[in-house]
Amino acid sequence: MPGRQRRDGGSGPAGQNGPNTGDNRGGGDRRGGGRDDRRGGQSAEKSNHIERVVTINRVSKVVKGGRRFSFTALVIVGDGNGLVGVGYGKAKEVPAAIQKGVEEARKSFFRVPMIGSTITHPVQGEAAAGVVMLRPASPGTGVIAGGAVRAVLECAGIHDILSKSLGSDNAINVVHATVAALKGLQRPEEVAARRGLALEDVAPAGMLRARAQAGSVK
C-alpha cells in the first residue's frame, strides 16, 4: 500500500508538468510553421522565374594530398518577359552548384528590347571564340536556335527569332556570346534621339507596323 501511495503521489504535481511540457512543444511547432509559411512565400516569388541548367561539369584541383573534385553549373534565369541573366556556380555537390548559379544569374539580370515576341533588329555577339548572330522573325516562326542559345532566348521570353552560332561550340562561350548580342540591342527611340532624326527615318516601316500591332517596345 505505501508503494501505491508513492506511485499515486508521483502522478500529482509532477504529473501535471507533463501536459504543460506538451503545450510548450506544440507552441514550438506553431512557431516553426510560421517560419515555413514565410519561406514558402519567398519560394513562391522565386518560382515565377524560368530556370534552365545548360551544362554541368566535374572539375578537379590537384593539391598536396591528391585531387579535389567539384562540380560547376551554367544556369540561365529569366522571367519570360524580357528579363534574363546568366550565372556560373561551383560547389562540391551538384545541387549546391546549381543554386549558386541561380543566385549569380539573378544578380546579373538585364532587360532585352523587344517588339512583340521578337527582337528589335539584327545583332551579332562575340565571347572568346564564340559568335552568335540573331535576327528578328515574323510571328509564328518560333525559336530557330540550338540548345545553349535556345535556353537564353526562351528564358528571356523571345518566341520568334532566327539565330546562327559560329565559331566555338563550347556552351559557356555560346551562352556569353548570346548575352553579348542581346545586350547590344537598341530601341528605335534611342537611335533616333542619338542621331537627331525622326523615328520614321530610323525604323523600317515593317517594324513600326509590328510595334503598333504588338504595343509599345518592352
Swiss-Prot record:
Cellular component annotations (GO), alphabetically ordered: small ribosomal subunit
SUPFAM superfamilies xref list: dsRNA-binding domain-like, Ribosomal protein S5 domain 2-like
Biased composition (Basic and acidic residues): 26-49
Domain of life the protein comes from: Bacteria
Pfam families with a match to the protein in the record: Ribosomal_S5, Ribosomal_S5_C
Coiled coil (residue ranges): none
GO process annotations (BP): translation
Alphabetically ordered keywords of this record: Ribonucleoprotein, Ribosomal protein, RNA-binding, rRNA-binding
Keyword Calcium: no
Region of interest (Disordered), ranges: 1-49
Domain S5 DRBM: 49-112
Cysteine disulfide links: none
Keyword ATP-binding tagged: no
A GO term for molecular function: rRNA binding
NCBIfam families on file: rpsE_bact
Family: Belongs to the universal ribosomal protein uS5 family.
Domain notes: The N-terminal domain interacts with the head of the 30S subunit; the C-terminal domain interacts with the body and contacts protein S4. The interaction surface between S4 and S5 is involved in control of translational fidelity.
PANTHER family listed in its UniProt record: MITOCHONDRIAL RIBOSOMAL PROTEIN S5
Role summary: With S4 and S12 plays an important role in translational accuracy. Located at the back of the 30S subunit body where it stabilizes the conformation of the head with respect to the body.
Assembly and oligomerization: Part of the 30S ribosomal subunit. Contacts proteins S4 and S8.
Protein name: Small ribosomal subunit protein uS5
Lineage: Bacteria, Bacillati, Actinomycetota, Actinomycetes, Mycobacteriales
Gene giving rise to this polypeptide: rpsE
